Amino acid sequence: MGWGQFIEVNVDLDMRRLSEGDRQLFNSIEEDMKQYYLNTLFSPEVDDLKMSIDFHLVLESVSRGGSQIIINAQAIFTNKRDQYFYAKGIQFPYSQGQKIIYTPSFDLDPLASFLNYYAFMFIATNLDTWEYMGGTSFFNRAIELSDLGKDSDWSVGWDDRWKKSRKIKSNQYLRSMRFNYFTALDALGAEEVDITIVKNAMSIFHEDLLTLDKKMGSNKETLHFLKAYHESIAELLSALNLKDTLELLLLYDHDNKKVYESYLKN
């Protein structure tokens, strides 16, 4: 366990596409990336998030230009619940045993900055559960970092990351749904339950989903969120007798249709 925002990090390195000789370069990178996430304090203001992530890195090729070794890769990051990021177009220079060092200033380091970007995205989404739009400053850090990446000598993949962070930040409906769902859960877990807070939060949740459906239609990030929490959401809505919201979810989230139907029958 480290002393940063992440308390559990599982790194899985896939080197099947590399030659046996090239694989020797990466003896320590798995552990180095894990320790980087565990021991980096990405922001001293939010040091109690206790996040866990899985990080699957596929090394696609190793090329040599002059004295540099250049790595091309793709990756999947997930918090094993509602956050899932697929990263393609990862490119960075690397030398055997290279240490990954965090610098708070906005100097682009192709490998560290790539890791920082996803740290910022996980932190932003987590903060959105604690405070309304609480993750905005971290979404902005991810966007600013992507801007730097796009304008750097290592621009591959950064335009996609720039678009992704802007898209998620601008989806105020999902961000509000997430906040209000967790607000309702917190209120239910209090020593003295104020049912008005719970009902108000889930009423806003309904309005947000309704507006999101009208303005955006099927949204990948929203469906990931519902995939993770649909059972708990349905149980809560049923207890509150909010059948309209269950019916809305039934139409929006087809993959979990049977769950919503079962709670509507109760």
Would you name each region that the model predicts?
Residues S67-K167:
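Acidic/His-rich structured neighborhood in mature extracellular/periplasmic domains
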Residues D12, K199-N266:
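A cross-kingdom marker for long, charged
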Residues G135-T222:
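Flexible, glycine-rich surface segments
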Residues K34, L38-F42, F120, A124-D128, ...:
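Sec-exported extracytoplasmic/periplasmic mature domains
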Residues Q5-N72, R81-Y84:
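Start-of-domain marker
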Residues E20-S28, D109-S113, K220:
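Soluble non-cytosolic domains of exported or imported proteins
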